[in-house]
Amino acid sequence: MKFNESWLREWVDPKVSTAQLCDQITMLGLEVDSVEPISGEFSGVVVAEVVECTQHPDADKLRVTKVNVGAERLLSIVCGAANCRQGLKVACAIEGAILPGNFKIKKTKLRGQLSEGMLCSFSELGIKEDQSSGIIELPADAPIGVDIREYLNLNDVAIEVSLTPNRADCLSIAGIAREVAVINQMEVKSPVIKPVPATLSAPIEIDIQAPSACPHYLARIIKNVNVNATSPLWLQEKLRRCGILSIDPIVDITNLSLLELGQPMHAFDAEKVKAPIQVRLAKDQEQLVLLDGTTAKLQTNTLVIADQKNVLALAGIMGGEASKVNAETKDIILEAAFFAPLALTGRTRQYGLHTDASHRFERGVDPTLARQAMERATTLIIEICGGEVAEVCEAINTEYLPKQPIIRLRRTKLDSVIGHYIEDRLVTDILVRLGLNVTCENDGWIATVPSWRFDLEIEEDLIEEIARIYGYNRIPNNALLAHLTLKGSAEKVLEPNRIKTVLVDNDYQEVVTYSFVDPKIQQLLHPQQEALILPNPISSEMSAMRVSLLTGLLQTVLYNQNRQQNRIRIFEQGLRFIPDASAESAVRQEAVFAAVIVGEKHIANWEGKSKAVDFFDLKGDLEQILALTANKELTFVAKQFPALHPGQSAAIMLNEQEVGFIGTLHPSIGQKLGIKGTPIVFELLADVVSERAIPVAKEISKFPANNRDIAIVIDEHIPAREVLSACYHAGREQLTAVNLFDVYQGANLVVGKKSLAISLTIQNTEKTLTEEEISAVIQLVLDELAQRFQASLRD
């Protein structure tokens, strides 16, 4: 919101400097982004009148003028502006004047003619937003000889504030003035708005077909309007200083309503509207050429203003080219309405638009403003353009107008939240000055919210308002009033951050990928898994909810490889979305951990090149995570997956249930995706690693450990993990460690057999074991293996 200080001070004029005023506005929560002077630094420029204007004898584009600056004689000034003419009141820089850029005005000759000053344009005075190429044209009653800075009030600044979306009430001079008046305990001096009596009868039928989107619509015909009149300088200057160019009186007045009151308005050429006026949703295949010349193909969720035949405007957004007011317009229809924020939210983005009107309607406009704005605009139109006024025609559905909430504020709640006692009298005063209708109770207040405050709904909103107006800087820094009790955490909980730390310590980097993925890539990886398809996706490449984190991780690998990053180790914790009719919203959300590695195992160094990562590198990293958990029954079972290499993949099992997978990406899929190298991936349900093994104190033996190696022959299909588990079971507490250090298949072994070389560590906490006792433990192990797996010692 951009406005000029002098306009604000017409409404409320606190005895503070510009800097103090800006500080007040910022402390009110309306952050001041910039404060800029209206004009450049200059002096010696006065109001003057062109008494004579003749053609320069030696230059076609120059004129020789006699100018009255209020001095004893007329000044001779040469001017090149096309709009220079006899009788015009102008801004004249006299001899000795200093213009912006330290440009000094001196007597000189131009093509042989004496020039004793300069007739100035806005840009030459450092006034921005001026597109005219001519000199300034002042009103005919401008007093000659008066300093132009004083006459135009150029000792003014433009203030721009950044508003949060909830403070739409401050998108106007009236709204800012209300806030400044509250903090300075002053009254707002708003312009007196009186109803304009009708001088003719010209009723307009209004048909509101979408009352929930537009519960209130007003229209008025004004006939015999002089659209070609010139907007008065005060109106042009108010708009200019707010960053809006003057176009014509009708548009300027509707823009004034928007800036002054916060009520967007629009004017139609009455001859181009065939009553009744309809407020409805767009029909299929309808189009509208907008004021900016673009053609909008209307969607059926768009609210429009229409007549019997055509769409006239996008309601609350932009008017149409066909019904706009132009130089030939004689009669106009003036419109003011309330459009519900939800009816307009997102519509501007559908058409690539953003207008001052839509910016306000999307956030909320005071529903009581339309009538005031209509009368204010009518008064100005009659004053500037003349015309005959018809009655105001109105259609209203009070059922759909915003309700004014009634909020109960408790004294105990106020003290608890703020942590500082504010007197009842002061609390009441603040609420009343904010425009609330307040009733005091023994233990609090009952407050009715004003129509312009859409952001006040609950008790905490009122507390925030009280603290804001009272002043956050006046609230002391006290200790918290709440009694806080530290809540203990279960020792068995394995925090996700602990798992992430293990991965980071192993040189992984955490990534966060979109939950929306390319359905084609996901189908390639998980052809048997149905996915949830979004009805309104961001793009076709992000139209499916992920059923695995694998899709996003592999796309991240490709993204990095395309940027010359060949050694990649990444992981992600996130949700996957599995369609399930029995789940809430028919989607089962599962938290998972996933990772992928590709490239070299280590960065190459002076010891030599590093080898590429393989299946067992990732399996080892995963086993470090599993070692933290209480689930010691987690196992790896060979299994084929569509996305993985058939000979290098496994399911992660817990109590005969599949809880994850690990493996090498299928070469054909890697080729289709354009991924270089051989990525290895895993995905694991987060619930499986949510509990950690609680540490148990064990006695450390002071007696020597005894290592013995055995080599057994078993069927090749028997997993080594089952053999190791059987060893532990047989050796009991005296077998402290079992390690597989070699696997052999080939010569000297029967086909279908394999040899496992296992190291056994035997130790007792109470004594040194004898050879006989050691041999007894080994024999127990061999007997167990022979019984369960028909294992035999290798010769």
UniProtKB/Swiss-Prot annotation:
Q: How is the cofactor bound?
A: Binds 2 magnesium ions per tetramer.
UniProt catalytic activity: tRNA(Phe) + L-phenylalanine + ATP = L-phenylalanyl-tRNA(Phe) + AMP + diphosphate + H(+)
Summarize where Mg(2+) binds, as residue positions: D455, D461, E464, E465
Residue runs in coiled coils: none
Q: List the disulfide bonds.
A: none
- The EC number of this protein is 6.1.1.20
The tRNA-binding domain extends over 39-149
Q: Which GO terms describe its biological process?
A: phenylalanyl-tRNA aminoacylation
- CDD domains membership: PheRS_beta_core, tRNA_bind_bactPheRS
- Domain annotation B5: ranges: 402-477
Where is it mostly found?
A: cytoplasm
* The keyword Ribosomal protein is annotated on this UniProt entry: no
Q: SMART domains attached here?
A: B3_4, B5, FDX-ACB
Which Pfam family, any one, appears in the UniProt record?
Answer: FDX-ACB
Q: What class of enzyme is it?
A: ligase
Q: What does the UniProt entry say about where the protein is found?
A: Cytoplasm
A GO CC annotation recorded here is: phenylalanine-tRNA ligase complex
Protein family membership? Belongs to the phenylalanyl-tRNA synthetase beta subunit family. Type 1 subfamily.
Oligomeric and partner information: Tetramer of two alpha and two beta subunits.
- This protein is called Phenylalanine--tRNA ligase beta subunit
Q: Which species is this record about?
A: Haemophilus ducreyi (strain 35000HP / ATCC 700724)
Q: Which gene encodes it?
A: pheT
